[in-house]
């Protein structure tokens, strides 16, 4: 029974505030506040309707997007993968071109997995890219994009037409 104190120490460490603080940020909900720096950015939490960070008399908050086919040049990912469809399908949510992903927290790492449509073949192989913690990531969203999974607590902005 000499292992019991070590097990108890590990359990306490796993539940400590620093371990909890390292968890993915909370996924936004309609009506919750968002930072003004995210104004006009959108997010699309898995299994929900897309949200936009909109400003008003009470400040900035996440609002449900009315359009069934939202498209934006600014997206926010919050840790868990956010999957969007590109120009390889009808009603793309993200356009191809040069993008920059900026971590919203110094420990966050932005990453993306892209799958393009290959004419006559179907979906091509995944193309992965990942930035360093706290550092912006520059990437090209490929033409004929089928899907992209964005990860990290990051603001993604299109920088070219």
Give names to the regions the model predicted.
Residues 97-101:
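A short tyrosine-centered beta-strand micro-motif
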Residues 1-24:
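Secretory targeting and sorting signals
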Residues 17-19, 49, 95:
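Generic detector of short, well-ordered, non-transmembrane alpha-helical segments enriched
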Residues 13-15, 45, 91:
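Generic detector of ordered secondary-structure context
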């Amino acid at each position: 029974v000499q292992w019991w104190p070590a097990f108890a120490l590990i359990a306490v460490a796993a539940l400590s505030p620093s371990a909890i603080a390292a968890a993915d940020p909370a996924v936004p909900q309609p009506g919750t506040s968002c930072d003004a720096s995210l104004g006009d950015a959108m997010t699309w939490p898995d299994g929900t309707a897309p949200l936009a960070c909109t400003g008003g008399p009470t400040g900035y908050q996440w609002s449900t997007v009315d359009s069934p086919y939202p498209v934006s040049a600014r997206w926010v990912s919050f840790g868990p993968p956010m999957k969007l469809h590109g120009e390889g399908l009808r009603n793309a949510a993200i356009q191809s071109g040069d993008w920059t992903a900026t971590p919203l927290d110094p420990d966050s790492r932005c990453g993306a997995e892209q799958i393009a449509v290959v004419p006559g073949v179907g979906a091509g192989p995944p193309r992965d890219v990942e930035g360093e913690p706290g550092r912006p990531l520059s990437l090209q969203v490929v033409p004929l994009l089928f899907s992209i999974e964005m990860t990290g607590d990051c603001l993604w902005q299109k920088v070219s037409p």
